[in-house]
């Protein structure tokens, strides 16, 4: 069972309590924690759109601690990050693996950060399918298209060549925060504000 901390604030009208995530959202902080899946993606997309409507000029901060997850859910978040007007500052706390690393790299250039002990991992998309041979072939072609799209966007965000991205994502490729910076997945490694 998960317990979400509450924050109590004094206002002119008395006390007001928020769950910690709602309070941080007031400060334009979104937490992307855990597996990337459809429900999480819908919540994060909604938060991005809400924060854009509140102030389209002020940065949005996404703190990432994720082992990765669904490519389609991740792409919904990624596309919205690119779509909204505010700059998106991404910050890796803990880990940003697979789709988490892709979203970390998808932040606004110059505003992608990792904390010193963060771990980042990139790899090719995973998939599995059972069924008739012709259906398996259709799904295999689709995952290859997705792989190409992800590689092209990673190359764009990191400045690496598509050939290097293809090589480096062939298997799980783990990096320290400093290695992720050298690779172009993040712009800074920060120990303190």
Curated annotation (Swiss-Prot):
GO biological processes: protein quality control for misfolded or incompletely synthesized proteins
Subcellular localization(s) per the UniProt record: Cytoplasm
An example Gene Ontology CC term for this record: endopeptidase Clp complex
Key words of the record: Cytoplasm, Hydrolase, Protease, Serine protease
Known EC number: 3.4.21.92
Active site per UniProt: 98 (nucleophile), 123
GO molecular function: ATP-dependent peptidase activity; ATPase binding; serine-type endopeptidase activity
Reactions mediated catalytically: Hydrolysis of proteins to small peptides in the presence of ATP and magnesium. alpha-casein is the usual test substrate. In the absence of ATP, only oligopeptides shorter than five residues are hydrolyzed (such as succinyl-Leu-Tyr-|-NHMec, and Leu-Tyr-Leu-|-Tyr-Trp, in which cleavage of the -Tyr-|-Leu- and -Tyr-|-Trp bonds also occurs)
Pfam families: CLP_protease (PF00574)
EC main group: hydrolase
Family as reported in the entry's similarity comment: Belongs to the peptidase S14 family.
Main function: Cleaves peptides in various proteins in a process that requires ATP hydrolysis. Has a chymotrypsin-like activity. Plays a major role in the degradation of misfolded proteins.
Subunit structure: Fourteen ClpP subunits assemble into 2 heptameric rings which stack back to back to give a disk-like structure with a central cavity, resembling the structure of eukaryotic proteasomes.
Annotated protein name in UniProt: ATP-dependent Clp protease proteolytic subunit
Organism taxonomic ancestry: Bacteria, Pseudomonadati, Pseudomonadota, Gammaproteobacteria, Pasteurellales
């Amino acid at each position: 069972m998960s317990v979400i901390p509450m924050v109590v604030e004094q206002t002119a009208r008395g006390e007001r309590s928020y769950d910690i995530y709602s309070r941080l959202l007031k400060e334009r902080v979104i937490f992307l924690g855990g597996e990337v899946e459809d429900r999480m993606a819908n919540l994060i997309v909604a938060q991005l759109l809400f924060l854009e409507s509140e102030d389209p000029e002020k940065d949005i901060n996404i703190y990432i601690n994720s082992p990765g997850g669904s490519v389609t859910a991740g792409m919904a978040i990624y596309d919205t990050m690119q779509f909204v007007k505010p700059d998106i500052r991404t910050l890796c706390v803990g880990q940003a693996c697979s789709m988490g690393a892709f979203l970390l790299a998808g932040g606004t250039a110059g505003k992608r950060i990792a904390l010193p002990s963060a771990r980042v991992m990139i790899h090719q998309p995973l998939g599995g399918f059972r069924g008739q041979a012709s259906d398996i072939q259709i799904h295999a072609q689709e995952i290859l298209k997705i792989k190409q799209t992800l590689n092209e966007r990673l190359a764009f965000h990191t400045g690496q060549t598509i050939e290097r991205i293809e090589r480096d994502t062939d298997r799980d490729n783990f990096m320290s925060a400093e290695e992720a910076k050298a690779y172009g997945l993040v712009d800074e490694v920060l120990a303190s504000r």
